[in-house]
């Protein structure tokens, strides 16, 4: 009786309609939010499924050049990418004494001594030998192959200082693969993918030497050329001597979006003597990206690449997103593909690249700004290839993957 009287008294007041209106509004908003979340979740699931189907076809089409190791349906979360380095685990190839002298003579007055410092003997993890490492990969005469490969690398160093138009090679910290694992959150959502990469320490000279040995083995028809995901991580991991962060910049300019391709110098080792169209920035992980806890930050590496190669400092509204991990067969390297959304005009980008980029004159010959539409990208690709220009596999796969995440149809690059 008392409760009924209280209810009746409430409804007789002037405040009742107002309070009921607030409650009704909150309830309506709650129901609307739940419905919208469900619609967006279903749309994201359909989009993720569409992207996954597209990636299956891309993986098959690029299988001779690139092996896709993992892809997020939307994009990776920063906390779900882990790169750990064991600084005590080292694999280093020496530079022969006479080659060291030849490099020093060619680089006299052009390079600091620390830039051309090399190991005097092989350095391998405790309990292993060079021969044992070679045997585990089914490679005979591995020590002799490495020494021969090191001499070819030394010749490259000498030429880089002697030939006009070349920039001097230098040695520095780099990393080799110990292994990688991946996992997907059972709660669902590809954005919850976790990718863990374990690395050991090496140097740039060793990396180039392994690059030479790999191509020799490939010419001999060694099984390394058919490496799959398992053997890359567990058998031939010693040859993974680099990790590249590949980013395509997308400019927001005058209400339109433009993707930026860079034409890389043919003097770069992975261009093999011919300038090619590539992603906007391709930065390798180095000692600069190593944090005090032994971890590497891929986002920091991408930001450094944009700054050093393109003169771009990220602004608060800019965003870097990573989509796919891959293995580049032609160079036996691991990499990650992503995009950088930049609030910059084409003119601003060009101005900053000319004025602020540290590596621009050495590595990049020119830029191409292409409207981010299927028709414009396809026309640019057709025009350039008909003119005899080439695109790297990373650039072709990269634009396909970035386009897929932005709702564009297959480009067939």
Regions found by a protein language model. Give the residues of each.
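Hydrophobic alpha-helical transmembrane segments
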Residues: 9-25
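Short, strongly hydrophobic alpha-helical membrane anchors
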Residues: 1-11
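Juxtacatalytic substrate-recognition/specificity segment
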Residues: 307
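N-terminal leader/linker segments that precede catalytic domains of diphosphate-processing enzymes
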Residues: 25-304, 312-413
């Amino acid at each position: 009786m008392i409760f009924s009287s209280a209810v009746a008294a409430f409804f007789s007041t002037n405040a009742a309609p107002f309070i009921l209106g607030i409650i009704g509004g909150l309830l309506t908003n709650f129901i609307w939010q739940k419905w919208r979340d469900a619609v967006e979740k279903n749309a994201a699931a359909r989009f993720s499924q569409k992207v996954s189907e597209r990636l299956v076809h891309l993986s098959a089409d690029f299988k001779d050049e690139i092996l896709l190791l993992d892809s997020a349906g939307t994009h990776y979360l920063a906390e779900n990418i882990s790169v750990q380095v064991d600084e005590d685990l080292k694999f280093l190839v020496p530079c022969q004494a006479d080659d060291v002298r030849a490099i020093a003579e060619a680089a006299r007055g052009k390079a600091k001594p620390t830039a051309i410092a090399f190991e005097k003997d092989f350095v391998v993890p405790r309990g292993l030998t060079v021969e044992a490492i070679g045997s585990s990969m089914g490679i005979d005469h591995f020590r002799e192959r490495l020494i021969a490969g090191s001499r070819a690398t030394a010749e490259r160093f000498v030429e880089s200082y002697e030939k006009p138009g070349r920039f001097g090679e230098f040695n520095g910290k780099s990393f080799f693969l110990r292994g990688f694992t991946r996992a997907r959150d059972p709660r669902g959502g590809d954005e919850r993918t976790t990718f863990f990469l374990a690395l050991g320490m090496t140097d740039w000279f060793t990396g180039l030497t392994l690059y030479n040995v790999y191509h020799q083995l490939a010419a001999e028809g060694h099984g390394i050329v058919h490496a799959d995901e398992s053997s890359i991580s567990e058998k031939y991991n010693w040859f993974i001597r680099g990790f590249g962060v590949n980013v395509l910049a997308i400019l927001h300019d005058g209400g339109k979006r433009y993707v930026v391709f860079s034409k890389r110098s043919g003097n770069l080792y992975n261009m093999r003597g011919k300038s090619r169209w590539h992603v906007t920035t391709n930065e390798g992980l180095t000692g600069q990206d190593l944090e005090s806890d032994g971890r590497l930050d891929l986002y920091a590496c991408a930001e450094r690449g944009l700054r050093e190669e393109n003169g771009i400092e990220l602004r608060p509204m800019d965003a870097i997103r990573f989509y796919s991990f891959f293995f580049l067969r032609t160079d036996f390297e691991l990499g990650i593909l992503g995009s950088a959304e930049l609030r910059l005009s084409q003119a601003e980008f060009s101005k900053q690249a000319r004025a602020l980029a540290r590596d621009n004159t050495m590595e990049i010959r020119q830029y191409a700004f292409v409207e981010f539409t299927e028709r414009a990208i396809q026309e640019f690709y057709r025009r350039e290839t008909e003119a005899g220009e080439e695109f790297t596999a990373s650039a072709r796969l990269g634009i396909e993957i970035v386009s897929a995440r932005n709702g564009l149809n297959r480009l067939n690059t």
